[in-house]
């Protein structure tokens, strides 16, 4: 049993190493992404040295035929420039690069100011909540007079009524539709 586990582990290690070696032997990535521009635009840069470079998006040409620029502006990142991009020269084609922007319309940037604002607002709200509980719990309730404790509200005879015997009314029997036996 132990030999099988060892053999399976050895097979897994060898297959992972082969995948790593195969990945390093591939052509280097020639397309670079610059998404940290001040205006919010996304810029692709091709590492080919050819004079004419064609840009491909999802396999179709998106650049003019005689384009000589090695950069391609995808536009604003708010327009969601998704797709698989490649640059193609006369002799060589780059590896495909998949661009995907996760658009978050309701996100906030977490920095020290935002976090401290959240903490400050939380402390203030807890303070006001505790103050409200203290003021409400600290109030004296309306005290009833002791005279009502000494009065008998109902006479003893009025508390209970005996069941009517030998009548077949709705409440003269205990279960379901069974009538009381005589």
From Swiss-Prot:
One Pfam family matching this protein: ITAM
PTM description: Phosphorylated on Tyr residues after T-cell receptor triggering by LCK in association with CD4/CD8. Phosphorylated also by PKC; leading to the TCR complex down-regulation.
Gene3D superfamilies: Immunoglobulins (2.60.40.10)
Sequence ranges assigned to domain Ig-like in this UniProt record: 37-94
Keywords: Adaptive immunity, Disulfide bond, Glycoprotein, Immunity, Immunoglobulin domain, Membrane, Phosphoprotein, Receptor, Signal, Transmembrane, Transmembrane helix
Disulfide linkage: 46-87
Glycan attachment positions: 66
Gene deletion effect: The absence of CD3G results in a severe reduction in the level of the TCR-CD3 at the cell surface of thymocytes and peripheral T cells. The development of both the TCRalphabeta and TCRgammadelta lineages are affected by the absence of CD3G.
Segments in the Cytoplasmic topological domain: 138-182
Ranges where the ITAM domain occurs: 149-177
MF annotations from Gene Ontology: identical protein binding; transmembrane signaling receptor activity
UniProt-listed InterPro entries: CD3_esu/gsu/dsu (IPR015484), Ig-like_dom_sf (IPR036179), Ig-like_fold (IPR013783), Ig_4 (IPR032052), Ig_sub2 (IPR003598), Phos_immunorcpt_sig_ITAM (IPR003110)
GO biological process: adaptive immune response; cell surface receptor signaling pathway; establishment or maintenance of cell polarity; protein transport; regulation of lymphocyte apoptotic process
Domain of life of the organism encoding this protein: Eukaryota
Bilayer topology term: Single-pass type I membrane protein
Residues with PTM Phosphoserine: 145, 148
Span of the signal peptide: 1-22
Transmembrane spans: 117-137
Membrane side Extracellular: residue ranges: 23-116
Function: Part of the TCR-CD3 complex present on T-lymphocyte cell surface that plays an essential role in adaptive immune response. When antigen presenting cells (APCs) activate T-cell receptor (TCR), TCR-mediated signals are transmitted across the cell membrane by the CD3 chains CD3D, CD3E, CD3G and CD3Z. All CD3 chains contain immunoreceptor tyrosine-based activation motifs (ITAMs) in their cytoplasmic domain. Upon TCR engagement, these motifs become phosphorylated by Src family protein tyrosine kinases LCK and FYN, resulting in the activation of downstream signaling pathways.
Quaternary data: The TCR-CD3 complex is composed of a CD3D/CD3E and a CD3G/CD3E heterodimers that preferentially associate with TCRalpha and TCRbeta, respectively, to form TCRalpha/CD3E/CD3G and TCRbeta/CD3G/CD3E trimers. In turn, the hexamer interacts with CD3Z homodimer to form the TCR-CD3 complex. Alternatively, TCRalpha and TCRbeta can be replaced by TCRgamma and TCRdelta.
Name of the molecule in the record: T-cell surface glycoprotein CD3 gamma chain
Gene: Cd3g
